[in-house]
């Protein structure tokens, strides 16, 4: 079993700490659908088209198609767009 790095509880993707072959069990109860290169993102849950993609607990992109758990998340299925953000200042 391979262990994926999840950086924040809000994250719906994890990071591959090494190359992960297709069809391998990984933690979080999923199997890799694709080959996932070292350092790349893998979906930890179903992400619908138009949903935000979270890493570090922050929005890093928007899915441009449905993404299944275990699927490689990269420029082919993730895009960027402007959206309203809320900022919290700590004084």
Provide a role label for each language-model segment.
Residues 4-7, 12-87:
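Conserved SET/PR domain catalytic loop and adjacent active-site segment
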Residues 90-91:
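Short acidic DE-rich linear segments
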């Amino acid at each position: 079993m391979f262990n994926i790095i999840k950086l924040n509880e809000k994250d719906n993707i994890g990071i591959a700490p090494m190359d992960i072959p297709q069809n391998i069990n990984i933690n979080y109860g999923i199997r890799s659908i694709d080959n996932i290169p070292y350092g790349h993102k893998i979906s930890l849950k179903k992400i619908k088209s138009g949903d935000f993609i979270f890493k570090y607990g922050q929005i890093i992109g928007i899915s441009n198609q449905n993404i299944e758990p275990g699927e490689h998340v990269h420029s082919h299925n993730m895009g960027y767009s402007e959206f309203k953000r809320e900022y919290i200042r700590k004084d």
